[in-house]
Amino acid sequence: MTEPPAEPRYPHHWEADVVLRDGATAHLRPIRAADVEAVRTFHSGQSENSIYMRFFTYKSVLSDKELRRFTEVDHRDRVAFVITVAGAIIGIGRYDRLPDPSVAEVAFNISDAHQGRGLGSILLEHLAAAARENGITRFTAEVLPENRKMLTVFAEAGYEVSRHFDDGVVSLSFDIDPTEKSRAVMESREHRAEARSVAGLLSPASVAVIGGRAPDAGTATGGESLAEQLLEHLVRGGFTGPVHRVNRLDPESFPTIAAVGSVVDLVIIAVPYDQVPATVAECAAAGSKGVLIATGGFADDGELGLVAQRGLVRTARAGGMRLIGPASLGVVNTRPGVSLNASLAPTMPKRGSLGLFSQSAALGAALFAATVQRGLGFSTVVSAGNRADVSGNDIMQYWEDDADTAVCGLYLESIGNPRKFSRLARRLARSKPVIVAKSDALGLQLPPGHAVRTTQAPVGALDAMLRQSGVIRVRTIDELADVAQIAVSQSLPAGPRLAVLSNSLALARVVADSAAQRELSVTRTEAGLRLDGGPEAALPKLREKLLSALRSSDVDSVILTMLPVRSLSVREIAGTLAECAAEVGKPVLAAFSGFVDQQVTVNGLLHAETAAGPLSVPGYTSPGAAIAALAALVRYTAWLRREQGHFED
């Protein structure tokens, strides 16, 4: 008696969570024999026109034989993928190997309700990858000429497609080896989808906060609950959409997210640890578009916590949601039409052009505090926490298209996908400075809660990768703020030539030595500035010296480093510096040694009201810190020139 043939080994590595064109998520996996009823249900929901486009005839139902043929595959000569949301199939793509073993015929069937979301392109990408793995080099397809949507999928895939019309059918054929164009198409699709998914989280039309205590719980637990703080900050920050409170312990709140009665764009979850999985599932069932989990724990708590965290991501993605956290400090979007402070910051941060991303809560809080203390303003702030789903890569995709963000700052404790990070950072750095603070041990040991692999590359290789990507690599939070305050307020330095102005010969020498160590060239020095006689006499002198230096053809940047002058305030000096920098279009920095000004933070962005409007100039208490920050931007502009020399957008 012969043994029945063994069931083909299921290729788990082909499964993937995917982001659709509108930013929602779905799950892609190989089809299974157990999918018979799901395929039957999918087919019964299709319109006559969609069925005709797929089968070239109308089939009101699929026979049992057809269903078995469609669902029983060998994952080699016959491969099929399904895309699911909440367990329901919304798209099917398949290939069947032809007598020529290097060629396979490909076909797609997309749910009427989900057409236009990019499912066909995603299925084609994954089918091509599986086919290449199985030794197939070419796809063919037969498409009715009126099926313009499917023809467009092939035409826009980036392959060299040959076509001919025969007997009322368009026959297509193309090699599936990746080309430069097909890679660009895939990266562009990925970029648009991921950027849009983050935009939905940072610009929600509605927000709900789930959590809190019973109204009569008092303050025995130490003040407001996490949910109450987040809710208060949302309202106080002036969020422009509706804010819903969900707390089953409070009769004046909605008992569940479903009870809100409308789809909520962003749900903030601040419930006890053991309630988080069920709460995420409830949000998915209610059709919520994204969740932010402020509750800590999970991967921080060892293997069982890691398993639970992965379960949260599966639930969210299966329900079409993106997930920030767990252990997230929140997100901020200062755009006036949004005004979202879904964070633990008690007041809405000042609006500006710096985008900020951090991972673990502790370092995220330190980074945010340091940049706020410097007087920097923000476009968006994202704390990813354990970054179980949304990561720095996603945020960079968003920043690339965000007109509100001119400078990007990231504090990284780990990089889950260095190759993708390098590709995205390089593309982003072509248009905006990308400042990355990382420890020298990045990649060698994961921080608690970061459920990603550690890179096997040595630290030196990671640094080289960052340099080649155009990233401005710094080592500390303070260094990130040092560079950011120049980048957000000044023009980029055109080169390394520096003019030094000072009222102290000793300080001028210190700056010159520091500049030489940083490969900057001091081409002009004015070390005998006399700024006495009060503002009326001193400021015009300062302005004259500054403009003379800035207008010099051998000067790219100017630094003013000085000891205190009794008759001049930091604010008065800053106003003159800012005006001159704006007038000429070259960067100006100020290093104040020994200054104590109760009204102004000397080490930070110095703001001034001028005749040209509100302007600012970067201030430092250490000349060395100022020079190091400037040198980092000089290296960036040199990289930018090299990159633009051989890159065509």
Indicate residue ranges for each PLM-predicted region.
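Long, contiguous binding/interaction regions
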Residues: M1-V198, P204-V207
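Catalytic-core regions of core metabolic enzymes
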Residues: D177, K181-D649
